[in-house]
Amino acid sequence: MNDAIYKSIKTLPPLDDTVVKIQQICRDENTAIGELVDVIKKDPMLTANILHSANSPLYGFSREITEINQAVNLFGMATIRGFALYGAIKQNFKINLDPYSLNSEQFLDIVSTQNALAFDWCKKLGGEFLNVISPASFLMEVGKIIIAKELIESGKADEFKKAFDEIKSLKELSELEISLVGVD
């Protein structure tokens, strides 16, 4: 692995206490959803983000969701865990995805849409894998933040962006990232 990428990963900011508590609660099979709601209520920004998402057409809930306990019950612990991770990314990362021709708003929209798709897909399959797939859907694009940072710092962003505009497949994207940054 590229040393600069390794250092970037090692220096990522720690998760805040709310996110850590949510992670712990969601890992404990004996935890009641009420405990999760209590932790979320202490974080107004997370509460607002969850309620905003619950009322987004992406999730297709049939009525307006006004209470955080309603949203937590509808989404379930796994998706709430993902929202907490998403909020941590949004708050703690300086997102500059210019090499990928994305701004932070577009990036966060992609992450949110991926989670909505994962949520719907898992629900149709009975929700069995939601505890893994939902948080993963939020995190799978984080590598782009780190790679973009390395491209910018190493002076390869323009070269990457020019080649990126010609990319036609994920395989080609992976090959480009490997060739310029040295990771896959």
Listing of model-derived features with the role each one plays in the protein:
Residues M1-D184:
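Conserved alpha-helical "signature site"
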